[in-house]
Amino acid sequence: MKSIMVKYTELPREETIYIGGMFPVGKVSAVVANGGVGKSWCVLLASLSITKGVRFLPNEEYPVWNDKDVMVIDTENRAKTFCERVILAGGSLERYYVPGEDICSAITYFDKRDKESIEEEIQDPNTMMVIVDSLAGFNGGIDENTVAASESIKWLGRLAQKYNKAVVLTHFLNKSEVTNRINTENMRGHSSCQQYMELIWAIDKDKGSEKIKRLYQIKNNITEIDDTVYRFKLTEASAEFLVTPTAEETSLKEKRAKIFEANIDKSDKEIAELILIEEPTSYLHNLVAWVKRRRKG
């Protein structure tokens, strides 16, 4: 059990640091996916970049440490599993702790005293990251469309900004696919909390393999999926990234480019509809976003 009382002093604000290349310090971010895809595992592996000095995302430039701490607010009754995974991944249990509880316990209900305890311990200068697994559990099982979820994001966001910590939420996405419409109301709640939610990562299964996952960065406007897609296999103790695009993916990009160039004078939606004929499993709003980015160069 870890309980450290320190006097808080304002930390210097420099260029944003991204833990594991994914999670900005001083902001709230999230990983969303369907059940069993690997949200918690993904967040844990990314956190090893500050507790063990192991890089997560490939081909990305970001600093690493091997002596920073991670606070785990576990609401899924899985802190013991999280503990086992830390060991499996070769991390140190001394670097992971649940506020006010043993690492193998779990907080299942948050009242005023729990939040006071969290704020006391988050001030520890060695704590760099706070994992909230999950957003729904943190709100007592309430989904993301409620005022309670919005208020929780704002509360966590204020802590992230005040104490310069990376706060990461996991959230079960109740959708047929991650790339389905993810609107502003779903993860950001009211507009007043948008200043705290920096970005969202989404994971889904690769259509060609049950073992391969796809990791997307969802842009700030929420409906736009980033072109950058990381494909990886979750192994027993790590993630094996597949940085080389498949022939099918390369061919798909070439087809899109040809359709765009041949119809450049048409509207964004018209071009997207032509691409949709070749990609019937895609979503029109994502294709429109792709055309807009293509026009900007």
Regions found by a protein language model. Give the residues of each.
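Short gly/ser/thr-rich secondary-structure transition/capping motifs
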Residues: 9-17, 112-113, 181-185
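The Walker A/P-loop phosphate-binding site
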Residues: 1-92
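Conserved inter-motif catalytic segment of the P-loop NTP-binding fold
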Residues: 19, 63-147, 151
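Phosphate-binding/switch region of NTP-binding enzymes
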Residues: 30-31, 36, 40-41, 63, ...
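Conserved, well-folded catalytic cores of nucleic-acid-processing
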Residues: 50-53, 89, 138, 176, ...
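C-terminal regions of RecA-like/P-loop NTPase motor modules
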Residues: 65, 123-126, 161-162, 207-297
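A structural alpha-helix within SAM-dependent methyltransferase catalytic domains
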Residues: 44, 48, 119-122, 157, ...
